[in-house]
UniProtKB/Swiss-Prot annotation:
Residues 76-131 form a coiled coil. Keywords: Coiled coil, DNA-binding, Nucleus, Stress response, Transcription, Transcription regulation. Plants overexpressing IRO3 are hypersensitive to iron deficiency. This is Protein IRON-RELATED TRANSCRIPTION FACTOR 3. It is found in: Nucleus. Residues 135-252 are annotated as: Disordered. One of its GO terms (cellular component) is nucleus. Residues 162-176 have a biased composition (Low complexity). GO terms for molecular function: DNA binding; protein dimerization activity. Pfam families: bHLH_IRO3. Induction: Strongly induced by iron deficiency, both in roots and shoots. Residues 208-219 have a biased composition (Acidic residues). Residues 36-49 are annotated as: Basic motif. It comes from Oryza sativa subsp. japonica.
Length: 252
């Protein structure tokens, strides 16, 4: 019987404790907090729409100030088109940048090679200059002879070498000149490259030989022999039979 009474008491106590636990702290919290100002959802939506409209207006003015239609759809299509163009330009610029970087690297390599070659050439030039100075100091006559010796003067085109002078004929020789007679070979002379061309004389011009006029005092040489008579002799008129024995008698 005791446990049943205890159960009834517990059931009797529980609703009162539950009321204290439930209503006590909730009522305290409500009293402590201030009631906030309520903003309607429609007002918040209006504020958002106004802010978006301002942003679209600024974007439209940045893209095209004198636009016929300021609709949001037109502004969005224009912005997407411009963004695509900008992206394509960025891509092409990146490719150009890569090619230019490769070319710049190649140019720097060539410049370094040219600088090395230039240094090598300068060293060779300095070595050659030192060698020339040593030779000039070692043999002074060599340097003066190389610089002070006059260059050979080329002869004028009208000059005639001794070997090319025509031979004057003697008074006893005839004055005939053969047309096929060639001049004697010319001596080889080393001349600079700026020499004037010499005229090649194929035929020797001989002065006309004047026949010496015989003087009256001098007589012409009498070398002409008298002609022999060609009349038939007595022996030629003889017959052959008579002539042979006579020839044999003469031989005896």
């Amino acid at each position: 019987m005791v446990p049943s009474e205890r159960g009834d008491v517990a059931t009797a106590i529980r609703p009162a404790a539950a009321d204290k636990l439930v209503h006590g702290p909730i009522s305290d919290k409500k009293c402590r907090k201030k009631v906030p100002r309520k903003v309607h959802k429609s007002e918040r939506e209006k504020l958002k729409r106004g802010h978006l409209n301002d942003l679209f207006g600024e974007l439209g003015n940045m893209l095209e100030a004198d636009r016929q239609s300021n609709g949001k759809a037109c502004i969005l299509t224009d912005t997407t088109r411009i963004l695509r163009d900008l992206l394509s330009q960025v891509k092409s610029l990146r490719q150009e940048n890569s090619t230019l970087q490769n070319e710049s690297n190649y140019v720097t390599m060539e410049r370094n090679e040219l600088q090395d070659e230039n240094g090598a050439l300068r060293s060779e030039i300095s070595d050659l200059q030192n060698e020339l100075r040593m030779r000039a100091t070692g043999s002074p006559g060599w340097g003066h002879g190389a610089t002070g010796s006059p260059l050979p003067v080329p002869p004028s085109p009208g000059t005639v070498f001794p070997s090319q002078q025509p031979m004057q004929p003697s008074p006893m020789t005839t004055s005939t000149v053969f047309p096929l007679q060639q001049p004697l070979p010319q001596p080889t002379v080393i001349e600079p490259s700026a020499r004037q061309p010499l005229e090649l004389k194929l035929f020797l011009e001989a002065p006309p030989a004047e026949d010496p006029e015989p003087s009256e005092d001098q007589e012409a040489p009498n070398n002409v022999a008298r002609p022999q008579p060609r009349y038939p002799t007595e022996a030629s008129s003889w017959p052959i039979s008579l002539g042979l024995p006579r020839m044999e008698d003469e031989q005896m």
